[in-house]
Amino acid sequence: MANCRKFAVLLRAQTQRLGCQFEFNTIVSRIEPQPGSGVNLTLTLTASHPGGASSDRGARFDAVVICAGLAAVGMLAPLGLRLPLQAVVGHSLSAAVREPMDAPQSAVLDARHGISIARLGQRVRVAGGAEWGRESGAPSKAALQRLYSALADWFPGAVRLGGPAGSVQEWRGVQATASDGMPLIGASRLPGIWLNLGHGQAGWSVACGAARALADRMGGRAPDIDLAASSPQRCGL
């Protein structure tokens, strides 16, 4: 069990040291494959961008990787790529440790209820549950109650549930899951458009491996794993 947010922050810092540039608060409003000459993107800066909102500007790339989760459905529909992705909603909560002796020392999986409980430094995180849902919405009270109940059953009194607002963090996240349960990793039928989508609940677990395999394919190298079962071509993409 690891802290995926901390990993992402450290990964961003490392990639920036290697020359990677990030464009936050920027909308990709159009994708235009140019056979033999790369991919043109139309970008729009939002009001939250440090430079303020602006009119559209263009950018050209040799190739692009679409890894935008459910947002990829709307991005690629104008190009005729109909992604077979569905939204699966998961919940988690985290709270500060009250009594270290009562808190978990390693990850625990409640297989009956599909809930994991893990120690992350001085906090305990409880996550689990999967249900079909929408991309937006408030956390489900029933789903959160199942997490609280599992925590109380396994580690009663281990965390501080009172205190100031925000001391207990409740979270709702949406995972993009392909209809056949397999991710979409590889080249699409459009030149220069590559996909890395639909990992579902395994996203955090396979993120690095999927990225490495895709980078190998884009670089003309044979990946260490066979991506045939994850090819977008199986879905006509």
Where in the sequence are the language-model features?
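Helical element adjacent to the flavin cofactor pocket in flavoenzyme catalytic cores
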Residues: 1-35, 39-49
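Mid-domain beta-loop-alpha active-site segment that forms a flexible
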Residues: 1-12, 70-71, 143-150, 199, ...
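Active-site catalytic microenvironments for nucleophilic, acid-base chemistry
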Residues: 14-18, 78, 213, 217-221
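Short, conserved active-site loop motifs that form the nucleotide-linked donor/cofactor pocket
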Residues: 19-21, 124, 193
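General beta-strand structural signal in soluble alpha/beta enzymes
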Residues: 23-24, 66, 195
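Active-site substrate-recognition segment that forms the wall
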Residues: 30-32, 38-39, 58-189
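Short acidic, glycine-rich loop/turn motifs
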Residues: 43-55, 97-99
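C-terminal catalytic lobe of FAD-dependent flavoproteins
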Residues: 111-112, 155-237
